């Protein structure tokens, strides 16, 4: 076996281990923080500070009975968790943890990630359809509608970063950030994070698993290891979204004094903690509100961000960076407030004032 294949195999094992360990940490951190937000201790029995609780839960899932409904399409039912999980793992192949520390430095890295991430929804639909359960199918159909609605503003928000760097390579995008793009693209970051949270079904966009409406959504009929794969997929998606946000907007691995990988992981944790804070703060939206927020609010803002970015590229050489950052932040708040005045997500159906 050549050195290339040995290095590839070693990196794949390390990457898979990183994702699994990160998911366990994310689960523990989310449960502890949500507990604090709700004035309760959270998991605190298994190990010090409840650190072993995710491992105990994982063991419990692995040893549970794997039940397949008698009316289910058994082949599709069995395949769905794999179709949903594998694309999420493939996304990490093009994400740089440090300069050149990635499985492959694709010159179309961000395009590859967007393409691969879209396959996950097929696995979710397979799970909902094959279960022969109306709640599962309803959750899957909600997923498709939500993914299609929010994919457009997500791609347009990333396009602003591509315009600034002139590259689709994730590695080159990080190297181009002398100033983190969150300062030059605050509106793009807002649109990206909002759309990404909808894509990975985090509160307030978690309609496909709305317990009070459709039980557990698309994986209502799943148990055992198959359910564990879906659970792992959801948190791995959040990890991927946080890593992409770090790469595109927060300067990736760049930072003073400490090792680049440390900075990259620290920024990922910062994004994830913000997502947890949003979950603890906001209630779940209705399906019509979610659709309206994507099409009537985020889509116009993402288009406005492209226009602003084009002006930045034209006039940036003549404007001080600090002034440009101030203008961008002011424009972002102005546009968000303007659109929030036009579109009201209050009682009844969403309407234009």
UniProtKB/Swiss-Prot annotation:
Membrane topology: Multi-pass membrane protein
Main localization, broad class: membrane
Pfam family of the protein (one): NADHdh
GO molecular function, one term: oxidoreductase activity, acting on NAD(P)H, quinone or similar compound as acceptor
Residues passing through the membrane, by range: 8-28, 75-95, 108-128, 148-168, 179-199, 229-249, 258-278, 297-317, 319-339
Reactions performed catalytically: a quinone + NADH + 5 H(+)(in) = a quinol + NAD(+) + 4 H(+)(out)
Alphabetic keyword roster: Cell membrane, Membrane, NAD, Quinone, Translocase, Transmembrane, Transmembrane helix, Ubiquinone
Enzyme class: translocase
Subunit-level organization: NDH-1 is composed of 14 different subunits. Subunits NuoA, H, J, K, L, M, N constitute the membrane sector of the complex.
Role played: NDH-1 shuttles electrons from NADH, via FMN and iron-sulfur (Fe-S) centers, to quinones in the respiratory chain. The immediate electron acceptor for the enzyme in this species is believed to be ubiquinone. Couples the redox reaction to proton translocation (for every two electrons transferred, four hydrogen ions are translocated across the cytoplasmic membrane), and thus conserves the redox energy in a proton gradient. This subunit may bind ubiquinone.
Protein name in the entry: NADH-quinone oxidoreductase subunit H
Species per Swiss-Prot/TrEMBL record: Dehalococcoides mccartyi (strain CBDB1)
